[in-house]
């Protein structure tokens, strides 16, 4: 640990390398934890590459898995994954701020300029304030999401398992990770007719997708006219792609009997809305993706690419 500490805080090691090394270390430790027999329900050793892929996906909130998380991993293993999702969801700059706050180190000019440009602040005081706001907002929104989801999960799974499901999926949605522990390998397909679950997850995904800088701007300005250009562009783009995406999916899948063709109009709109919100980044599914039309798959690619350019 002393060697790691010296490496992380060596004066010649720049901040980007420190954070990169920190994330790599977290991913590796997470993989080793998932390999332990206690992490699997069958109490078997998970192959290293499978564990490493899962922890990398969780930390980078991509949502890709080689293993059915809900069916394979135990409560301990799921908790490790959830911790990594939360850590990854906080983001690069937030972790950077926390590192400086905890270590009580002064930020150099180069790092100060990097943080100022990214966060829109020029002082360490502003950075500390933003980091605290990020932690508070994240905790509050994820808690509210878990409470709403518990309305469905607790009656179905019992109090403790239901609350765990609620917390896990709330955090996963808010961090745009897309991990689920339903256990049937079909993501949210079993809740495709449940507006409470789908809308709650979609709202969490949308709010989380705005980013911390936009939240801080909204909290500080409290008025649309006073928001900076960056915040307005992100908010309007989010609304645009959700609305247009919903409409496009609704049209393209309207007559597809393998997806929403046999559903009522209301259920078609709900499924199209959820697909539009989650396709861009979150990865939750309420439809079987292989059954989508080719045009819908192409549109999904457009939505995912749009995230890169915003």
Describe the predicted segments one by one:
Residues 1-308:
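Membrane-proximal intracellular helices of multi-pass ion channels
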């Amino acid at each position: 640990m002393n060697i790691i500490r010296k490496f992380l805080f060596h004066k010649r090691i720049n901040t980007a390398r420190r954070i990169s090394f920190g994330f790599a270390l977290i991913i590796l430790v997470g993989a080793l934890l998932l390999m332990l027999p206690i992490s699997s329900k069958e109490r078997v050793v998970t192959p290293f590459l499978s564990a490493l892929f899962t922890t990398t996906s969780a930390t980078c909130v991509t949502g890709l898995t080689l293993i059915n998380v809900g069916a394979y991993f135990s409560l301990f293993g799921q908790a490790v994954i959830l911790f990594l999702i939360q850590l990854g969801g906080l983001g690069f700059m937030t972790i950077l701020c926390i590192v400086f706050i905890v270590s009580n180190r002064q930020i150099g000019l180069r790092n100060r300029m990097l943080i100022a440009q990214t966060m829109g602040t020029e002082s360490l005081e502003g950075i500390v304030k933003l980091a605290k706001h990020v932690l508070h907002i994240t905790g509050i929104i994820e808690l509210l999401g878990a409470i709403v989801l518990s309305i469905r999960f607790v009656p179905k799974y019992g109090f403790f398992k239901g609350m765990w499901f609620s917390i896990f999926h709330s955090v996963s949605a808010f961090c745009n990770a897309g991990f689920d522990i339903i256990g049937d390998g079909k993501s949210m397909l079993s809740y495709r007719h449940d507006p409470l679950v789908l809308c709650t997850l979609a709202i969490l995904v949308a709010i989380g997708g705005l980013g911390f800088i936009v939240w801080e701007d909204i909290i500080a300005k409290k008025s649309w006219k006073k928001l900076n250009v960056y915040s307005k562009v992100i908010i309007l783009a989010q609304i645009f792609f959700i609305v247009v995406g919903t409409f496009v999916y609704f049209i393209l899948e309207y007559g597809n009997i393998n997806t929403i063709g046999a559903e009522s109009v209301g259920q078609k709109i709900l499924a199209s809305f959820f697909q539009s919100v989650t396709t861009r980044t979150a990865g939750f599914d309420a439809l079987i993706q292989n059954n989508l039309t080719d045009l819908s798959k192409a549109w999904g690619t457009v939505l995912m690419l749009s995230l890169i350019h915003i």
